[in-house]
Amino acid sequence: MKVLGLETSCDETGLAIFDSEQVTSDNKGLLGQVLYSQIELHALYGGVVPELASRDHIRKLVPLFNELLQQCNITKDEIDAVAYTKGPGLIGALMTGALFGRSLAYGLDIPAIGVHHMEGHLLAPLMGANPPAFPFVSLLVSGGHTLLIAAHGIGQYEILGESIDDAAGECFDKAAKMLGLPYPGGPNIAKLAESGNSDAYSLPRPMLHRGLDFSFSGMKTAVHNLIKDTPCSGGSGNGSDSDPQVRADIAASFQHAVVDTLVKKCVKALKQVNMSRLVIAGGVSANSHLRKTLERELAKINATVHYAPPALCTDNGAMIAYAGYERLQAGQADDLAVSCVPRWPMTELPAV
């Protein structure tokens, strides 16, 4: 079965084709994928502008679809089903992909299914070279979400913890903006932190010893105050008198605080549910400091960590195609009505 996946939940336009008959140890059925990022568009504003995101998806969907067909060397008539991101995300952006996908499926007389964006991230590591077996704990960490989930099977999800305010990725972006770094903040903070001392400044770890929920708003405030009160930080009010080492130390200290919080919660979650496999997915999962720290700390408790392939860490169509395939195989499909859900708890998903 060839499934076209469409991802338009935020600022990436991602399309991919998953072919269940081409699953090998090398590509796990990914026939091809194309991805267009709107980073340059939104960098001018320091963050994603929803209306601009929607309009850009509209401009890019058809050209990217044609490019994907050419890359895979197939025609549209060879597509067997369509999977599109139904939510959560920016409602206008979601609607562009949903309407394109549902219309294409109707025209080709093939089934279509709306996919949960975060389930796509959760299942993306199953497309890797060393896919984890259920059950496992999953840390879904991105610009819009920070979730700890006990996954017992596809659609069998138990929320162990989540952010009660800002997501970890959002905190990265805002801290980067305070330091005068360009959007997106996560990769730029990580790059700057490489030359910094993570022990230079002490930052709080909110709710570290209070269950499995997360809170990053206090950390964001602490970074703001640190930058404001530190000479030569290059941040708000200090831009003309900046010291590269001071800025690198702040970035490294901030990154270490976020990573320390995430890792300790993951270890606690694994112990709480008596599992030994951790899956980490979402844009922040690409952070090398997070990966190294997780591998070191999980080795101490005889647990393993699994990631999505590098190209599938950020938003992409491949994860949507694969998640859609799994649900289509279980006999699930949507009717002609198109609906998108900006907020959608994963616990509401049906089991496969």
UniProtKB/Swiss-Prot annotation:
It catalyses: L-threonylcarbamoyladenylate + adenosine(37) in tRNA = N(6)-L-threonylcarbamoyladenosine(37) in tRNA + AMP + H(+). SUPFAM superfamilies: Actin-like ATPase domain. It is found in: Cytoplasm. The keyword Iron applies. Binds 1 Fe(2+) ion per subunit. Fe cation binds at residues 117, 121, 315. PROSITE patterns: GLYCOPROTEASE. GO terms for molecular function: iron ion binding; N(6)-L-threonylcarbamoyladenine synthase activity. Keywords: Acyltransferase, Cytoplasm, Iron, Metal-binding, Transferase, tRNA processing. It is an enzyme of class 2 (transferase). Its EC number is 2.3.1.234. GO terms for biological process: tRNA threonylcarbamoyladenosine modification. NCBIfam families: gcp_kae1 (TIGR00329), T6A_TsaD_YgjD (TIGR03723). This is tRNA N6-adenosine threonylcarbamoyltransferase. It comes from Psychrobacter cryohalolentis (strain ATCC BAA-1226 / DSM 17306 / VKM B-2378 / K5).
